[in-house]
Amino acid sequence: MGPVDQPLIRHDGFVEFVAEQLAPLGEVRPKRMFGGWGVYVDDVFIAIVAGDTLWLEVDDGNRADYDAAGAPAFRPFADRDTVMSYREVPADVLDDRTAIVEWARKAMEAARRSGTKPKRRVKRRSD
């Protein structure tokens, strides 16, 4: 199976591209959520894909990169002031494999610092 293969789930082309770009970091697993996608790397939730936009987890450890690029914060609701700790990845970073892997690695570190717990896998008993 490839980096984003999940039975019975169709991935769109952009999600496939994101997964391929992030593959050097570990096991990439996109998961459908709220009309978009959540992206896990080695069971750490690091990103949101909404349309053709990738948003990575941000904290004080990597915020300066996004500020320097003028990258906006993720606002899940157009009619509210709610801002989440994800920022848009600039197109030039997304298209550069070395750069996106570095930015995503920093997002993994941010996710770990924020206390995002790895998703527990349920083991099925075989009788």
List the predicted regions and their residue ranges.
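Charge-dense, helix-prone N-terminal extensions
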Residues: 1-127
